């Protein structure tokens, strides 16, 4: 079973004396988990640590223990910067070819992934001409092409309209990924598909559990209140 476990994790960025994460203990297994909290609470940094990119990409200092068991794919907020090829087809071909698949197998996977993500009609269009919502689906398709056991998404609803959000929720509920971790404050979209919510405050986990069981703590009322929008 794929899992991620953090034990007493502290993290800070280069040239900063302030710890962004402060003694985080968190374990995620085969489940759909949303990480929420106020702006500046450390959500994005936590996902970077959980995906393994924090030190590799940003450097800085990490203390504690991070255990990652399983193939991880990470889609950051700046997802469009990580699409390297001119068209979605070329992007998927590039990723799948690196997995030593034959040409026929690559084409089969492109067809499967494009149908799953609803980007079949976008495959040969230039990425720069796509809307933000369309680019986001391409970015998620690229992540799925890596055949991950753990998929981590940072603020996936930030650049899409309500209809696009409904479509994305439907997509996320049917991806078939063992472990799904999402950083998001628009909980109204995800309330019906998540197994657990983790609330961050000032770099610390202040609640981890079900939406229904969340305590009436003022530190977590703010993100949970978004369910009543």
Task: For the regions a language model picked out, list residue spans one by one.
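Catalytic Walker B motif of ABC-type/P-loop ATPase nucleotide-binding domains
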Residues: 151-154
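H-loop/switch region of ABC-family ATPase nucleotide-binding domains
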Residues: 183-185
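Conserved ABC ATPase "signature" region
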Residues: 104-122
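Hydrophobic anchor residue at the start of the ABC signature
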Residues: 140, 168
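A short, flexible loop at the N-terminus of ABC-type nucleotide-binding domains that lies
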Residues: 1-6, 10-23, 54-59
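Conserved ABC ATPase signature
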Residues: 126-130
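Conserved beta-strand-loop-alpha-helix hinge in the C-terminal portion
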Residues: 204-225
């Amino acid at each position: 079973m794929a899992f991620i476990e953090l034990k007493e994790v502290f993290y800070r960025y280069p040239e900063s004396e302030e710890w962004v994460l402060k003694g985080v203990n968190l374990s995620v297994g085969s489940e759909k988990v949303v990480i929420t909290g106020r702006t500046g609470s450390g959500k994005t940094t936590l996902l970077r640590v959980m995906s393994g990119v924090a030190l590799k990409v940003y450097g800085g200092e990490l203390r504690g223990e991070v255990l990652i068991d399983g193939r991880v794919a990470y889609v950051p907020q700046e997802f469009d910067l990580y699409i390297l090829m001119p068209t979605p087809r070329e992007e998927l071909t590039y990723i799948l070819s690196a997995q030593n698949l034959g040409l026929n197998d690559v084409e089969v996977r492109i067809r499967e992934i494009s149908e799953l993500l609803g980007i079949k009609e976008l495959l040969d269009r230039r990425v720069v001409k796509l809307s933000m919502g369309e680019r986001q689906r391409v970015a998620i398709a690229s992540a799925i092409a890596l055949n991950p056991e753990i998929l981590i998404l940072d603020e996936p609803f930030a650049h899409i309209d309500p209809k696009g959000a409904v479509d994305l929720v439907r997509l996320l509920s049917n991806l078939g990924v063992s472990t799904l971790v999402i950083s998001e404050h628009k909980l109204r979209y995800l309330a019906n598909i998540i197994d657990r919510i983790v609330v961050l405050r000032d770099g610390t986990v202040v609640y981890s559990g079900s939406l229904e069981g969340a305590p009436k703590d003022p530190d977590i009322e703010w993100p949970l209140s978004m369910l009543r929008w």
